[in-house]
Amino acid sequence: MTNVQLVTNNLIHKLERYMDDAKSIYILTSFVMKSGVDVLAPLLRKAVEKNVDIKVCTGDYLYITQPDALEKLYDIHPDIEIRLWRSAGKSFHPKAYLFERESDGVMIVGSSNMSRSALTSGVEWSLLVKESVGEEAFSEAIDQFLHIHMNEATQPINIETIKQYRKEYEEF
């Protein structure tokens, strides 16, 4: 495989490949749908059972993220650190999948949210870049992810915050 690749379909195959031997997995998607969690759950469960550091950050922008998706993601394993960006109406639209591995790092940045369609059969474009080609960009992506993930605009996902978000979602 080349060090830079355009991925236009079946992103799930790339995610599976890089999740398999990752030391850390960082997922940043503006929206999370239950269908996407259904696709990723087995891979996330397998990774967390190997003590992989997994962090997920999604947003409440336009209330597209489904409460059931957050609940299903939360139920995978308590060691997966999930946070919700509280947008206050401001656009929140990133999509990135970052993998730190023993040999290298890989970042996939593009149009794919966490939905079955985006991960499997939808028309999506993502750029896969290996750390060896874009070391500075990869390092910056990790730093920016961690900055967003721990930003004061985010809140940890737990039973109470899911309940609160569900109420807001239903009222929107």
Regions found by a protein language model. Give the residues of each.
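PLD/PLD-like phosphodiesterase catalytic module centered on the HKD motif
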Residues: 1-172
